[in-house]
UniProtKB/Swiss-Prot annotation:
It is a single-pass type II membrane protein. The keyword Transmembrane helix applies. Its EC number is 3.1.1.-. SUPFAM superfamilies: alpha/beta-Hydrolases. Pfam families: Abhydrolase_1 (PF00561). Ubiquitously expressed. This is Protein ABHD1. It comes from Homo sapiens. Keywords: Glycoprotein, Hydrolase, Membrane, Serine esterase, Signal-anchor, Transmembrane, Transmembrane helix. It is found in: Membrane. GO terms for molecular function: acetylesterase activity; monoacylglycerol lipase activity.
Amino acid sequence: MLSSFLSPQNGTWADTFSLLLALAVALYLGYYWACVLQRPRLVAGPQFLAFLEPHCSITTETFYPTLWCFEGRLQSIFQVLLQSQPLVLYQSDILQTPDGGQLLLDWAKQPDSSQDPDPTTQPIVLLLPGITGSSQETYVLHLVNQALRDGYQAVVFNNRGCRGEELRTHRAFCASNTEDLETVVNHIKHRYPQAPLLAVGISFGGILVLNHLAQARQAAGLVAALTLSACWDSFETTRSLETPLNSLLFNQPLTAGLCQLVERNRKVIEKVVDIDFVLQARTIRQFDERYTSVAFGYQDCVTYYKAASPRTKIDAIRIPVLYLSAADDPFSPVCALPIQAAQHSPYVALLITARGGHIGFLEGLLPWQHWYMSRLLHQYAKAIFQDPEGLPDLRALLPSEDRNS
């Protein structure tokens, strides 16, 4: 009798399974609705806040991360796997640097040259990819495509060696060294002196932008900046990336990519560093200890990380910059964000979403159709380029000695 009750023909198991499945789906949707869907937190001084909220509605709207992959690590991974690759054609510029190196700038070609505005005054979006990234990365292509659709020029600054070109010197790139970025900005401003320039730095590129702003202050050559998933504190970043799961998913693959770049340029790099020792690195910290700190003249990795962390330099920034980060970013923990400093800064605004991961920010059921970061660029660039008068007189909020510097 019991066997007949449990038999498949009875339908009990099927009904029970259907009921449990429906309950699981209901609980999942309930959790998503109650805990995942949140408005981002916008942290800024009152003047900058008053500019951003009406001009960038995305900063006050609920973020709807993709229903079936809202966890931070999944967002980070699926962004690479799922997003489409827009067709972008580039024309490359090769710049020579004072130390004998070379830089590759990729200028995106306008889709319809007959509709081009005056290039001498057309706004320019300068994009800086993440570590080992280039103009061919999916996230870069989407941002470039957005800039082109909005009627701006778009140019990508590729870090040395990241487009496959050979290094001319032993130096590749370093988060604390902004000399190459200064060279690029000066080149663009010399070529288009009347065109407003907005820098968009992603991850490692965002660190470069923040450090450049802090070092150059008003002479940064930019009207504003947007940084996406940048890391404010190098010590907290490496600590987070060295946890077991993050190490497996992110730290080890990134370190392998860095080692490949060194291996490709062995002949020029081995003059300064022990290549074989560098290639044994299994973490970014080990790579920075064995290569980056040596190549760029730092005593050790600790000294380098202190110089590379923008967290302690926020008070030196004198150009408006909007920073986007997710609270579940495996590269940049919330504890590393300069929230208190941003609350008192006239120039720095932090936009913190509850979900999004690292350069993830996938949204909607079909995340390859729309992207949160592209929408943010659209609204922020429009506000900066088309309504510069709407920006408050931020310099007036500074002490008199800073206004005159």
